[in-house]
Swiss-Prot record:
Organism annotation: Oryza sativa subsp. japonica (Rice)
Entry keywords, A to Z: ATP-binding, Chaperone, Cytoplasm, Nucleotide-binding, Stress response
Description of its domains: The TPR repeat-binding motif mediates interaction with TPR repeat-containing proteins.
Region (Disordered): 215-250, 674-699
Induction cue: By gravity stress.
Residues spanned by motif TPR repeat-binding: 695-699
GO molecular function: ATP binding; ATP hydrolysis activity; ATP-dependent protein folding chaperone; unfolded protein binding
Tissue note: Expressed in callus.
Entry similarity comment: Belongs to the heat shock protein 90 family.
Biological-process GO terms, alphabetical: cellular response to heat; protein folding; protein stabilization
InterPro entries registered for this protein in UniProt: HATPase_C_sf, Heat_shock_protein_90_CS, HSP90_C, Hsp90_fam, Hsp90_N, Ribosomal_Su5_D2-typ_SF
Protein name, as recorded: Heat shock protein 81-3
Keyword Chaperone: yes
Length: 699
């Protein structure tokens, strides 16, 4: 009975991806086999996990295997597994109508010059079959459904048919590739064996190749008589009897037989001793584990024995994955095995979020085989394993730090993770702090560690100074650094958004308190003369401070004479426990922020004025002469808004600020106000002409 065939269109992005794969020249097409074997291994993991709680799941096919069958007669290569299989809806959704988030991202990565071998990292490895095949047929049987056949030549559509007449799989999936004429090398036994060794040697299920074996069999002429009879007829030869006797004994014929040949006989690499494993073997294992096309940066292979037993191999990649901090995706970087049986990946309880970039495997002797995700959360053994893994990861980072070049690569890729670790991991905070690196006022183009900073501290210096901001360029000429630089103190530039969170938790390093250059309460060592001079200036400018506070009202909490600004007229500092300007910027950028919290944390600004600055001195004279002078009010507003910008805050009303600047330009250029009165109808008034002439003087 012929089954009905349904035709489906490929989802648009998948169609695009297929035409990219088919129409672009890629030199390393061989990765298709790695991807298909990797998918088979995942399907086998799933059925093995299901069978831990329900043994009957394996009834249809008790053996777990991957078979590879090259057929030179039909130019097809088949990859068969006894994994979980797919239902009809799985087939339709997973192979064509629903694009994974990785589809688009993979195409963007390809366009940016990435290697096609990255395909597996984006979850679309199946489509790599079209690198070598013009037609792909997928036959699959799931325990909960009948057997179905998926077929496509990638011409925009695929068909799905119920399979009533084909060979019954029992359970699992068979992918048959009809190879392109120029890709027939993938039917050669030697080539397939090399590829499995290169990419899939460490898959934990037997991968068997259907091989042709030719044997020479010795048989006597009598046995061979029947076969040869027809051929011998009519052939007359004069042979000597003795020779004939010899021939009879030594007759050989070639016999062709087929057999399965297991290609990955290695025992799991983590069960071997680290000293016996070569760098190349670790690299091959890492690649097969992660689908990465590059080698790892560093590896840690260890076992823990005693009350608790487990073995683990941890790898640090060379670069961060494209979706490292995508919270919607569970990172599946550590695979959990129990007594060599794969249990699950993306086990969140095994490693904290800040280490989500570390990849590897853990094989426990003590966990129960039928452990569920729910049980994992309460499991004491797992908590101990996790603690050990974190400790070993930190050790591994210190090992990487011994090589400056490697550590620079590592830090560029994963510094955010270390800073997240400072924020989240109170146990290891002081250790992680030693791994941090920053630019500073004295480090030039190099990065410096907190340890190195401490060794360079001035005599009598008891605090570590830092400034946070949007970029190195934005902070290196900040008014907050003027006094610190003048006195020769080194200041660390913390210009990563996550630094704000990290430094909030890292209060001190080696007993030295971390102090922000942008918050109030910055105390610098001063001589008696400096202190005396400061007191005099405070007294002298007290009146101006009051006037400025009256003009600005609740825009600032208070106005004080500064001892941190040397050249700039003024700056705005935040309370010791409030948000810095940079933190305010970060919080404003968060779509789901709590605005009531923002109001509370960000309203405490103190204006610090520089008594040594000519503008401030002139302003003081005017305020002393007439505290109701209208030009003073305008100048104070302009100085406040400029200070907002130079101190790293954003302007609430940039238009008014712009208008003030334009007004100043007109005054400077002696443009008559009446000429452009219409254009400036909406501008806040600069009051009267007397004010204008006074402003000109200041300018």
């Amino acid at each position: 009975m012929a089954s009905e065939t349904e035709t489906f269109a490929f989802q648009a992005e998948i169609n695009q991806l297929l035409s990219l794969i088919i129409n672009t020249f890629y030199s390393n097409k061989e990765i298709f086999l790695r991807e298909l074997i990797s998918n088979s291994s995942d399907a086998l993991d799933k059925i093995r996990f299901e069978s831990l709680t329900d043994k009957s799941k394996l009834d249809a096919q008790p053996e777990l295997f991957i078979h590879i069958v090259p057929d030179k007669a039909s130019n097809t290569l088949s990859i068969i597994d006894s994994g979980v299989g797919m239902t009809k809806s799985d087939l339709v959704n997973n192979l064509g109508t629903i694009a994974r988030s990785g589809t688009k991202e993979f195409m963007e990565a390809l366009a940016a010059g990435a290697d096609v071998s990255m395909i597996g990292q984006f979850g679309v490895g199946f489509y790599s079959a079209y690198l070598v095949a013009e037609r792909v047929v997928v036959t699959t049987k799931h325990n909960d459904d009948e057997q179905y056949v998926w077929e496509s030549q990638a011409g925009g559509s695929f068909t799905v048919t119920r399979d009533t007449s084909g060979e019954q799989l029992g359970r699992g999936t068979k992918i048959t590739l009809y190879l392109k004429d120029d890709q027939l090398e993938y039917l050669e036994e030697r080539r397939l064996k090399d590829l499995v060794k290169k990419h899939s040697e460490f898959i934990s299920y037997p991968i068997s190749l259907w091989t042709e074996k030719t044997t020479e069999k010795e048989i006597s002429d009598d046995e061979d008589e029947e076969e040869k009879k027809d051929a011998e007829e009519g052939k007359v030869e004069d042979v000597d009897e003795e020779k004939e006797e010899k021939e009879k004994k030594k007759k050989k014929i070639k016999e062709v037989s087929h057999e399965w040949n297991v290609m990955n006989k290695q025992k799991p690499i983590w069960l071997r001793k680290p000293e016996e494993i070569t760098k190349e073997e670790y690299a091959a294992f890492y690649k097969s584990l992660t689908n990465d096309w590059e080698e790892h940066l560093a590896v840690k292979h260890f076992s823990v024995e005693g009350q608790l037993e487990f073995k683990a191999i941890l790898f640090v990649p060379k670069r961060a994955p494209f979706d490292l901090f995508d919270t919607r995706k569970k990172q599946n970087n550590i695979k959990l095995y129990v007594r060599r049986v794969f249990i699950m990946d993306n086990c969140e309880e095994l490693i904290p979020e800040w280490l989500s970039f570390v990849k590897g495997i853990v094989d426990s002797e003590d966990l129960p085989l039928n452990i569920s995700r729910e049980m994992l959360q309460q499991n004491k053994i797992l908590k101990v394993i996790r603690k050990n893994l974190v400790k070993k990861c930190v050790e591994l980072f210190f090992e990487i730090a011994e090589n400056k070049e490697d550590y620079n690569k590592f830090y560029e890729a994963f510094s955010k993770n270390l800073k997240l670790g400072i924020h989240e991991d109170s146990t290891n905070r002081t250790k992680i702090a030693e791994l941090l690196r920053y630019h500073s006022t004295k480090s030039g183009d190099e990065l410096t560690s907190l340890k190195d900073y401490v060794t360079r501290m001035k005599e009598g210096q008891s605090e570590i100074y830092y400034i946070t901001g949007e970029s190195k360029k934005a902070v290196e000429n900040s008014p907050f650094l003027e006094k610190l630089k003048k006195k020769g103190y080194e200041v660390l530039y913390m210009v990563d958004a996550i630094d704000e969170y990290a430094v909030g938790q890292l209060k001190e390093f080696e007993g030295k308190k971390l102090v922000s250059a942008t918050k109030e309460g910055l105390k610098l060592d001063e001589s008696e003369d400096e202190k005396k001079r400061q007191e005099e200036l405070k007294e002298k400018f007290e009146g101006l401070c009051k006037v400025i506070k009256e003009v600005l009202g609740d825009k600032v909490e208070k106005v004080v004479v500064s001892d941190r600004v040397v050249d700039s007229p003024c700056c705005l500092v935040t309370g010791e426990y409030g948000w810095t300007a940079n933190m305010e910027r970060i919080m404003k950028a968060q779509a789901l922020r709590d605005s009531s919290m923002a109001g509370y944390m960000s309203s405490k600004k103190t204006m610090e004025i520089n008594p040594e600055n000519a503008i401030m001195d002139e302003l003081r004279k005017r305020a002393d002469a007439d505290k109701n002078d209208k030009s003073v009010k305008d100048l104070v507003m302009l100085l406040f808004e400029t200070a907002l910008l130079t101190s790293g805050f954003s302007l609430e009303d940039p238009n008014t600020f712009g208008t003030r600047i334009h007004r100043m330009l007109k005054l400077g250029l002696s443009i008559d106000e009446d000429e452009s009165a219409e254009a400036d109808a909406d501008m806040p008034p600069l009051e009267d002409d007397a004010g204008e002439s006074k402003m000109e003087e200041v300018d």
